[in-house]
């Protein structure tokens, strides 16, 4: 099969080509619950750039060369003898984690914290290829309204945004405020999920005019340009109190300190983006009673819920398509901020 293969790390992201488009050996069924999916779309994620940089080298513990791509959807190509409920040609979306289902975390539905798991595209070969080896437990059948190439990024970007917005929606009442920092690939999904799940007023912050336009089209009530005065703008919109919930899809630079400042007393700050550090005096945490919540992908059940929203047209993913052979173009465009929404590779 053809695949876009990572052969070496590039800490400065300065190479002309990050991956090599080449022929590799097809994956094979090895376990009764294995499934081979013919890829219809593979999302290109900023995590992939971090992988190229080598940031995930110690966590993923993979040997190069290997194939990235952890946001995948397609059609059943082949299934192991123990797989039921699927047949060849069924359109599916792949939860990003392959788990056994036996550990306590799995039985509680906390797929992300399974004691034993494989994360195709992170610690095993992923979907920057014509076919992908995954497990039946990770697959969700797609309704006829949703094509694999249109939904692939929901498996990580969409699911991560959904989980954070779902958490926030539980604490948001009509007349209250939610701030979303970053209206890019994850943020524009988070806006729509919040809009679908609660009646809070949504304030979106971004530095790019195009991203702010996208935010308005996704249902934001207010947009604020990140020009240095965004904290004051949010405080003005919220009567000086700040927002009950702040979802930070940036998580680096000054976004963290500003996000916490925008969070009202007894409010919730959800951190999704990463790369920075949270540094806050404990006395400030005590007196403000703010809650900081981390977010890691989402559960199988939450991906089912997100697909239900997409099926009803309540969430619409903005994508830009690239042929698999142009994976380097997609990665460079993402690195330089030229991708509105999410990039998707089509084999």
Located regions from the model:
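Residues in the short beta-alpha loop(s) of Rossmann-like NAD(P)-binding domains
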Residues: 208, 275, 298
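Mid-domain Rossmann-like dinucleotide-binding core that forms the NAD(H)/NADP(H) cofactor-binding site
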Residues: 144-228, 232-233
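Rossmann-fold dehydrogenase core element
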Residues: 268-270, 280-320
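Glycine-rich beta-strand-centered segment in the early N-terminal region that forms part
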Residues: 25-42, 56-104, 138, 143-146
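C-terminal hydrophobic helical "lid"/dimerization subdomain
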Residues: 257-261, 300-347
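NAD(P)H dinucleotide-binding glycine-rich loop of Rossmann-like/cofactor-binding domains
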Residues: 100-181
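Glycine-rich cofactor phosphate-binding loops and adjacent beta1-alpha1 units
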Residues: 169-174, 212-291
């Amino acid at each position: 099969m053809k695949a876009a293969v990572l052969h070496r790390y590039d800490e400065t992201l300065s190479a002309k080509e990050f991956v090599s488009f080449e022929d590799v050996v097809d994956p094979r069924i090895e376990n009764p619950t294995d499934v081979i999916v013919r890829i219809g779309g593979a999302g290109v994620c900023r995590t992939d750039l971090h992988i190229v940089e080598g940031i995930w080298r110690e966590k993923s513990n993979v040997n190069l060369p290997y194939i990235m791509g952890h946001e995948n959807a397609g059609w059943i190509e082949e299934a192991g003898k123990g797989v039921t409920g699927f047949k060849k040609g069924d359109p599916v979306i792949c939860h990003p984690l392959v788990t056994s289902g036996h550990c306590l975390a799995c039985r509680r539905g906390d797929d992300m914290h399974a004691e034993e798991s494989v994360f195709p595209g992170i610690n095993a070969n992923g979907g920057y290829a014509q076919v992908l080896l995954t497990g039946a437990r990770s697959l969700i059948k797609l309704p006829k309204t949703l094509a694999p190439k249109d939904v692939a990024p929901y498996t990580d970007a969409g699911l991560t945004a959904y989980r954070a917005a779902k958490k926030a929606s539980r604490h948001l009442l009509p007349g209250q405020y939610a701030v979303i920092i970053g209206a890019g690939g994850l943020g524009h999904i988070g806006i729509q999920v919040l809009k679908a799940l609660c009646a809070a007023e949504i304030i979106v912050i971004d530095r790019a005019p195009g991203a702010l336009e996208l935010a308005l089209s996704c249902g934001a009530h207010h947009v604020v340009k990140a020009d240095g005065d965004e904290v004051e703008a949010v405080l003005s919109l919220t009567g000086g109190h700040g927002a009950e919930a702040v979802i930070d899809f940036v998580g680096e630079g000054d976004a963290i300190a500003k996000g916490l400042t925008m969070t009202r007393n007894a409010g919730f700050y959800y951190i999704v983006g990463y790369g920075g550090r949270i540094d806050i005096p404990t006395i400030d945490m005590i007196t403000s009673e703010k809650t900081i919540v981390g977010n890691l992908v989402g559960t199988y059940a939450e991906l089912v819920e997100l697909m239900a929203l997409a099926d009803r047209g309540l969430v619409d993913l903005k994508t830009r398509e690239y042929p698999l052979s142009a994976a380097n173009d997609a990665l460079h465009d993402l690195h330089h901020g030229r991708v509105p929404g999410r990039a998707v590779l089509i084999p």
